[in-house]
């Protein structure tokens, strides 16, 4: 999967069609990817409505892997948009989830921010010219930044939500 910050979005038949402005390189091997097709993904937006997304599926002929192109307001493997996560973390009363879910979201974000900051520090050591200024971001911008970095460098694992939430695999 790849997170894109610059994308075109238009609605057709109630489905938001998301298309990245630039085709990103493969996060696994760095090869050039080709568009293979589209898939559907549903996410709850900040008003609590279910929003259908049509996402591009990209194929890397070099490593023979498929990747979905996600907009930066979608968190991988989560059904709520990033804005709901940020509102729950900031404890505003505008979020559309119950208090128990909001508490779980706050714990997940706290752990994810720690993991994202560690990933960025490691990248900064490997690439000293990397510019990082995420301390000045709002919660939503910081969340989008960390999700984009962690996913695009290949550090996001499908079990990351279990690892980050402190649940053991045993």
Show where each model-derived region lies.
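Short recognition patches in nucleic-acid-associated and regulatory proteins
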Residues: 30-52
């Amino acid at each position: 999967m790849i997170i894109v910050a610059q994308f075109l979005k238009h609605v057709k038949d109630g489905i938001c069609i998301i298309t990245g402005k630039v085709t990103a390189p493969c996060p696994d091997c760095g090869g050039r990817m080709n568009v293979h097709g589209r898939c559907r993904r549903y996410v709850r937006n900040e008003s609590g409505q279910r929003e259908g997304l049509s996402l591009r599926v990209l194929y890397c002929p070099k490593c023979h892997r498929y990747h979905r192109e996600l907009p930066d307001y979608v968190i991988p493997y989560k059904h709520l948009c990033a804005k709901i996560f940020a509102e729950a973390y900031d404890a505003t009363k505008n979020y559309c989830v119950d208090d128990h879910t909001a508490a779980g979201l706050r714990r997940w974000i706290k752990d994810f921010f720690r993991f994202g900051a560690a990933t960025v520090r490691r990248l900064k050591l490997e690439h000293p010219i990397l510019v990082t200024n995420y301390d000045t971001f709002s919660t939503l911008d910081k969340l989008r930044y960390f999700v984009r970095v962690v996913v695009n460098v290949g550090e996001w694992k499908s079990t990351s939500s279990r690892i980050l939430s402190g649940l053991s695999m045993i």
